[in-house]
Design a protein with these regions (language model features):
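Core of compact, soluble alpha-helical bundle domains
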Residues: 1-198
Length: 198
C-alpha cells in the first residue's frame, strides 16, 4: 500500500479520475463501489512501483478476472491504470516512466485487435454510443465501450463477464425498450465483426 500521505493522495486522485470517467460505476455500485475503487487504486499504486513486471501482469490478470466477472469490464481497469501512471508522472516528472503496466495494457490492445479489429471496434462503439445517447429515459455514458469491453472479456475466457454487465444494462425497470434493443443489436454486431476478423 502507499506509504506516505502524498502517495495516498496520488492513489485517491487516480481513483477519482477513473470513477468520474465511467458514471456506470456510481449508478450501479454507489458509495460502496467508490470505496472499493479507492482501495483498488492504492493497491495499483503499489504495483506501479513493483520491481518485476511479470508479477504485476499476473496480479493485474487476476484483478481483471475478478472485476469483469462482477460487471466491471476491463476497459475500466485500463483507464484506472492509465490514471495511476498519469498521477505519478505529474507529481514526479523527472523520474523514469513506470513500465510495470505496459505488458498488461499491450496485451489488452492486441486482444481487442484480434477479436474485433481496431477500426471496426472503435467504429461500432462510436455508432452505438450515439444511438444510446438518443434513447429515451435513463442513460449511461460510454455504455457501448463498456459492453464491447465485456464482450471482449467473455471471448477472452472470462466466463460470465458479459451477462454480469449486460443483465444490468437490459433491466426493463431501469432502461427503455429502445436502449435494451440497442444493447442486443450491439452484441449481434460484435459477433458479426468477430466472424469477419477470423
Amino acid at each position: 500500500m502507499p506509504q506516505t500521505p502524498l502517495e495516498i493522495d496520488l492513489a485517491l486522485r487516480a481513483a477519482k479520475a477513473a470513477w468520474e470517467k465511467y458514471s456506470y460505476l456510481e449508478h450501479r455500485y454507489g458509495e460502496r463501489g467508490r470505496r472499493f475503487t479507492n482501495s483498488d487504486s492504492c493497491w495499483l499504486f503499489t504495483l506501479a512501483r513493483a520491481p518485476r513486471e511479470i508479477v504485476v501482469t499476473k496480479d493485474l490478470e487476476w484483478l481483471r478476472t475478478v472485476l469483469a466477472s462482477r460487471g466491471i469490464p476491463t476497459v475500466i481497469l485500463e483507464s484506472h491504470l492509465t490514471a495511476v501512471l498519469l498521477a505519478i508522472d505529474q507529481e514526479f516528472p523527472n523520474q523514469p516512466k513506470k513500465i510495470q503496466f505496459d505488458h498488461f495494457l499491450a496485451d489488452r490492445k492486441a486482444e481487442r485487435r484480434r477479436l474485433v479489429g481496431a477500426e471496426s471496434g472503435s467504429h461500432l462503439v462510436e455508432v452505438f454510443d450515439q444511438r444510446f445517447r438518443a434513447c429515451t429515459g435513463f442513460n449511461v455514458e460510454l455504455a457501448a465501450e463498456l459492453i464491447a469491453s465485456a464482450w471482449v472479456d467473455e471471448h477472452s475466457g472470462i466466463s460470465g463477464s458479459l451477462p454480469a454487465l449486460c443483465n444490468w444494462f437490459t433491466d426493463g425497470e431501469r432502461f427503455s425498450t429502445d436502449w435494451i434493443a440497442n444493447v442486443h443489436e450491439l452484441l449481434v454486431e460484435l459477433d458479426r465483426v468477430h466472424g469477419q476478423t477470423r
